């Protein structure tokens, strides 16, 4: 965890004093952390404002937090000895309960015990056999009511109706209600009619037929007449007097519906509030309702993050949440005044179930020294979004334009990053040659397409040279990862100036840099803040500009490896500056026409460092090598921890990059055998991460180039003129179909490998007859018959493995792994 708990603080210490204590590090290199790594400081206080003498300190990473524990534990603040330990989250089962939670649980247990006691008493009461006498209270033989009851139940012919009339009248005389004049006001109101009395009798019969769980209510209903039977048992009371006692006075003008409702309420009150309770309290087996937070996340697939570090970056959250599923968007609002995060963010998942998994796993967890608070996010507001119904009412061309503009923001990869407007290319070449565009291409010439392709190749070479001088890593365009701050602006008309591009994009935010080559065919715009760049991309993509339409593309990451963005912190820039393409070709080397076949000089060289301590971090490795000349960046290779999601483990080795091969060799000699964190380092020059061109060049022993995506209209003569401009061709072959049409690819073989390399770099991305040429080195021809037979065997083995894989897939065994390369196949 990256959050520490500090106990036994002095009672006068506040947040500023606690931060000052943790910032007093004499040697950050040996301590393993720096004061800038502190992300949060909090002293816990009671409701009256007094300190509870403990607090929390957050750090940027787990490693720095562990180093701070070792450094500050059992240290002193003035004369008070403090205790420092790693803090636990609320979701940790080992966290002790607070006093308030313990009291709440104790009260809950008491309520549950009382409920259990009531249920037990009720069960014992229901198990005891009961008689009608017990229910009516007539089980006692000395009870005078029993005698009255037996006398009343005798056969009328045998009973002496005059026997006890006087005694009963005397006994019950206090209960007789004398009729007075005030009773006359009730004569105008009728009591319950026969129908209502019948309904009451039906309800009583239904209540008597209820199940065992309603026996208690039935008992109470039967006891009600016993309480009021003093008046009913008095033979001197007339039926009218008894009826008046049960009448309810009704207000004048009261509707009949209210009268019935009031009658129902009074009836339920007479039965102690349980007359209608059984129907409402009937237990129904219902499924437990789902957490509303989960329901909301399932609808939107969006999470709202709070309590974030103000210097946090979007990449931090992409790395944290990408382990749960594909991310559609990570939005980190930026304060335009400070250039820092506002303390909250939005994460949009493609699959809502992945968002639920991320919420359950990360809510309440510690991230960058702070407690991460996750809430369900509201759907993203898109005021310009049109649904299918609105699109149907628009013309087809407008529909396609809107859909293409909506998909542009989601596009992560383009096949041709250095695409240029063909008209702008021809204008640029004509201007550089001092002629008109119409004079550059003869419409009557048969090789006009070849001339146009050569002109484009020339402009591409100039653009590459310009970007190389500006510090742009050309090989980064082959990377799939995109940087939202970088926008490639293409397809604008010739004559567009750099101030015009800057003015157009500066409306959406502060710009860091705008680069446009002298050819004026492409531009690179870099924003300071990601949200501003996204807004500009969404508004300007496929927007009409002058006489053309703007094509925008998100630029690659690490476009400027040796330059940091102003909005980034130094430590983060060092991580972003890691270049994974050592031994890469510079633009000047690519355009070199020398006859020497030696490999081009490298722009930077990496040193492979192994036998690292698993606790050694990239910061510690950087501190060990940064004093050497030519040092660029150091990185310890990490891998995800399978046991702890979101954490990484060191692989025991790393790489240190230097600006030149000479500096790397000097560092190897100086640091080989150096002891770091108790481990003796072993160094050697690394050749990792070569770009695609260098890798293909090493494989190309022969000087043959495979040309893909060749237009079907292109002839062998066109290929010879186009590729012959960059060297001496040995052979050119354009395979054809049975009807003499081109098959869409060709082969061009040069006299030397250097000429093939020159043509490969110059024509990569060039268009011929509207098609972008895709070039790669072809496999060298077999030097003898045995080598040719081996290649044929490998091809046949691969085809057989593919057929076997297809058969197993049809048979339901598609999950079995098959060696499609034929490395383990038996020889023929």
Curated annotation (Swiss-Prot):
The UniProt record lists the keyword Nucleus: yes
Gene Ontology process terms (BP): rRNA processing
SMART domains in the record: RRM
Gene responsible for this protein: MRD1
Function noted in UniProt: Involved in pre-rRNA processing.
One CC-aspect GO term: ribonucleoprotein complex
Skewed-composition ranges (Basic and acidic residues): 241-272
Boundaries of every RRM domain copy: 2-89, 301-379, 485-557, 605-688, 703-780
Keyword Transferase: no
Region (Disordered): 97-125, 166-293
Species of origin: Yarrowia lipolytica (strain CLIB 122 / E 150)
Family: Belongs to the RRM MRD1 family.
Keyword set, alphabetical order: Nucleus, Repeat, Ribonucleoprotein, RNA-binding, rRNA processing
Official protein name in the record: Multiple RNA-binding domain-containing protein 1
